[in-house]
Amino acid sequence: MTTHAAAPSTRVLIVDDSAAARAMFKVIVESDPALQVMAAVPDAFAAARAMRTELPDVILLDLELPSMDGLTFLRKIMQQHPIPVVVCSSHVGAGTEAMVSALELGAREVISKPAARNDLERQEASIRICDAIRAATETTRRRSQPEPRPLAPGPKLTADEILPARPPRPVPETMPVVCIGASTGGTEALRDVLTALPASAPPIVIVQHMPRGFTAAFARRLDSLCAIEVLEAEDEMQVMPGRAIIAQGDRHLLLRRRNQGYRVSVLDGAYVCRHRPSVDVLFRSAAQEAGGNALGVIMTGMGDDGARCMAEMRAAGAETIAQNEESCVVYGMPREAVAHGGVGKVEPLDRLAARIMEFGRRHTERTVR
């Protein structure tokens, strides 16, 4: 009888100055049989000593550290040992700019340190942290199929919780509008797309999975780099050419038609596909409000958020594009969108900006005839 060796566990180095946080992260990491704690240390110097003996597969890093701050340590890691890093911090107010800097320095993911006020929140936090750690290794291992989650999550809610489904209905011609959904790897991918767009780009509405407090700084940073205007969403904000609106962290974003144009709604509510904001919620609102006036783009990310409601967009007459596997950090959401029949075209990351502009031109030519 042939025996098969178990797949090696992903070794995680935890770096956090709080003993309580280290203990919490150890329990979370060890709850996933695909992960193991290599070491849990209080500062960057202890982490460096641990790494002289053994290199981890992923580092779970707090930014607020004694002696050497987390950003400085992250910069040194990327220069000397480019190991996947997941930043996990509770500093989402004054530290928000630092979080965006962490992404630019090469952190694979930035997540908020869980409050864990009840059992459900602890369970959801465990799933998010383990997913982030597992996703951080995807670019190295190039898995196209995510491994099954070992944790038993609570009920996975659909967009029906926020916006009831309805059959496709004809909608009047309006301005074109582009709806984009992204998750793991999306911050860098969105920067690549948005910085390639001219000021004449069609209106864009974006859901990027990020926690509360991160998206304002993310939008400001993109706004400083782009020819288009990039803003964090506010309720009833006008959607207009040359503007990209990014969903607030921890709030759903919906598209609403107003005469020949659009505004956005910012809503609280249940997690959909275990996310708030949810791509499915945005895409369903686009299917119902914009129909064939919309382009849906689903980009790199783990899981299936956006897949079901991208199919609704396509059924309502929208054009739809998925980022291709080769250019994704994690080929999860695009793969699921293809599987659900919601994708009209598959394109590499470096072609998405051109496709957005082509859509805008085609739609404008169609409406002026």
From Swiss-Prot:
<dbReference type="InterPro" id="IPR000673">
    <property type="entry name" value="Sig_transdc_resp-reg_Me-estase"/>
</dbReference>
<dbReference type="GO" id="GO:0000156">
    <property type="term" value="F:phosphorelay response regulator activity"/>
</dbReference>
<dbReference type="GO" id="GO:0006935">
    <property type="term" value="P:chemotaxis"/>
</dbReference>
<comment type="function">
    <text>Involved in chemotaxis. Part of a chemotaxis signal transduction system that modulates chemotaxis in response to various stimuli. Catalyzes the demethylation of specific methylglutamate residues introduced into the chemoreceptors (methyl-accepting chemotaxis proteins or MCP) by CheR. Also mediates the irreversible deamidation of specific glutamine residues to glutamic acid.</text>
</comment>
<keyword id="KW-0963">Cytoplasm</keyword>
<keyword id="KW-0145">Chemotaxis</keyword>
<feature type="active site">
    <location>
        <position position="209"/>
    </location>
</feature>
<dbReference type="InterPro" id="IPR011006">
    <property type="entry name" value="CheY-like_superfamily"/>
</dbReference>
<feature type="domain" description="Response regulatory">
    <location>
        <begin position="11"/>
        <end position="128"/>
    </location>
</feature>
<comment type="similarity">
    <text>Belongs to the CheB family.</text>
</comment>
<dbReference type="GO" id="GO:0008984">
    <property type="term" value="F:protein-glutamate methylesterase activity"/>
</dbReference>
<dbReference type="InterPro" id="IPR001789">
    <property type="entry name" value="Sig_transdc_resp-reg_receiver"/>
</dbReference>
<dbReference type="Pfam" id="PF00072">
    <property type="entry name" value="Response_reg"/>
</dbReference>
<protein>
    <recommendedName>
        <fullName>Protein-glutamate methylesterase/protein-glutamine glutaminase of group 3 operon</fullName>
        <ecNumber>3.1.1.61</ecNumber>
        <ecNumber>3.5.1.44</ecNumber>
    </recommendedName>
</protein>
<feature type="region of interest" description="Disordered">
    <location>
        <begin position="136"/>
        <end position="168"/>
    </location>
</feature>
<feature type="active site">
    <location>
        <position position="183"/>
    </location>
</feature>
<keyword id="KW-0378">Hydrolase</keyword>
<dbReference type="GO" id="GO:0050568">
    <property type="term" value="F:protein-glutamine glutaminase activity"/>
</dbReference>
<feature type="active site">
    <location>
        <position position="305"/>
    </location>
</feature>
<dbReference type="GO" id="GO:0005737">
    <property type="term" value="C:cytoplasm"/>
</dbReference>
<dbReference type="Pfam" id="PF01339">
    <property type="entry name" value="CheB_methylest"/>
</dbReference>
<keyword id="KW-0597">Phosphoprotein</keyword>
<dbReference type="InterPro" id="IPR008248">
    <property type="entry name" value="CheB-like"/>
</dbReference>
<feature type="modified residue" description="4-aspartylphosphate">
    <location>
        <position position="62"/>
    </location>
</feature>
<feature type="domain" description="CheB-type methylesterase">
    <location>
        <begin position="170"/>
        <end position="358"/>
    </location>
</feature>
<dbReference type="InterPro" id="IPR035909">
    <property type="entry name" value="CheB_C"/>
</dbReference>
